[in-house]
From Swiss-Prot:
Belongs to the NrdR family. Binds 1 zinc ion. One of its GO terms (biological process) is negative regulation of DNA-templated transcription. GO terms for molecular function: ATP binding; DNA binding; zinc ion binding. A zinc finger (unnamed) spans 3-34. Keywords: ATP-binding, DNA-binding, Metal-binding, Nucleotide-binding, Repressor, Transcription, Transcription regulation, Zinc, Zinc-finger. This is Transcriptional repressor NrdR. Negatively regulates transcription of bacterial ribonucleotide reductase nrd genes and operons by binding to NrdR-boxes.
Length: 159
């Protein structure tokens, strides 16, 4: 590895330890020429996940986009940001583990709704109203009635 201080192409690893929940390795290095120390991180390069939108266009998976939607749905609700970040982590982990490079956007939306339903029901209805594009109050009321019925049966509603 090239030293960031003197550009010499020789370093020693002094310390190596897992980092970020074993997703990467933090290494403390020392340059063999100038003897200055620096830190590097090594992690697996993940292949990009592409989301196929309803109109057929593709865009790279964005954790931030999902988190923004969750935060907006949970505005003025007692839901800690950490819970929402865990939801995003779970969704990304599930999407990456399915082995597909391209995921339909409606699959992502349904995964978000499924998890949000268990986090906060009001936030779930808010998210659903935007995601499913409720056209009028009757559709909105129908979703609320399904939510109440599902709460009695304690399972996640499907379209």
């Amino acid at each position: 590895m090239r030293c960031p201080f003197c550009e010499y192409n020789g370093t020693r690893v002094l310390d190596s330890r897992p980092f970020n929940h074993n997703k990467s390795i933090r290494r403390r290095r020392e340059c063999e020429a100038c003897e200055r120390r620096f830190t590097t991180f090594e992690m697996v390069e993940e292949t990009p996940l592409l989301i196929v939108k309803k109109d057929g266009t593709r865009e790279e998976f964005s954790r931030d986009k999902i988190l923004r939607g969750l935060v907006r749905a949970c505005e003025k609700r007692p839901v800690p940001l950490e819970v929402l970040e865990n939801v995003v982590n779970d969704i990304e982990k599930e999407l990456r583990s399915c082995g597909q490079a391209e995921i339909p956007s409606n699959d992502v939306g349904e995964k978000v709704m499924e998890r949000l339903y268990h986090v906060d029901e009001v936030a779930y209805v808010r998210f659903a109203s935007v995601y499913r594009q409720f056209k009028d109050i009757n559709v909105f009321m129908k979703e609320l009635e399904e939510l109440l019925a599902q709460a009695r049966n304690s399972s996640f509603p499907k379209e």
